[in-house]
Structures are given as C-alpha cells and as structure tokens.
Amino acid sequence: MDMISYRLKEQELEEITKRLQEYKNSLLLDLVVLMDDGGRLVSFAPYVDSYKPIAQRVALVGAAVVGAVDQLEHVISSKKSMFFSGQEKNMYVHMLSHKFMLASVFNHKVPLGSVKLFKEKLSRELTTLLENALARGESRVVRFEDLAL
C-alpha cells in the first residue's frame, strides 16, 4: 500500500494537462509525463487514450529509476535530473519537487538544451499548482493492485 498526500481539483488537472500540451507542442516532443514519486500518472501529453498505457509505464518505471538513482546519488552527489539516450529517442527526467517528476520523450533532432530551457518555465508554472494540491494535505491509501499497468 502507498499513501497519496495530495489531491488535485478537476480545474487544476485540466490546467496541468493544457500546460503539458503547450510544452509538448512548442518543442515537438513525442510524449510528456507528469508523475508522482509513487509512480502514479498525474497527467500526460498528448492527451490521447492510445498514449495512456505508455504514459503509465513511463510514470511507474520512471519513478522507480529515479528512486533507485536517488539512493545511489547520496553517495556521489545530488542531482535533480537525468538524461537517457536511446537509438532513436531520448528521455529527460526532472524532479519538480520531492514529490513530482516530469519526463520528456523526444527525437534526437530536438536539442537537449531546448528541452531544459522550456522545462524551466513549465516547472515554475506546475510547481505552484502542485504545491496547492500538496497543501490541502488530504491523504488516501492506494493499493498496488489499483495501479493499472
């Protein structure tokens, strides 16, 4: 079981999704995923049903990788982001706060510097919305079985 210590209002979730879509479109990214530290999908862009299973996997695996690397980094140094390079696509994962992460999946033609630059503006916008959700302090329990893979 896991505890969720935030609750997003419908209008906040719509605003988050809108901003993720704008970020995705501004850089021609393939996928943008906002997740929490428990691997739960908060929102994603493009917001199309066919992308939801992929976004859920990115959220779950992304949070696990960030958690594992975080434990290793206590030995070396502290970082707030990770970059993964594949044959055709790259992924940049950035910690927005101690609770939320943003993953950007993009083609090699998109410069990493542009992703980082545009991510800074998005991070500031999202952090305000997410801090409001955390401030409400509503906790609920989620069973692992409830997470759809």
Place the predicted regions along the sequence by residue.
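Acidic, low-complexity cytosolic segments
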Residues: 1-31, 38-149
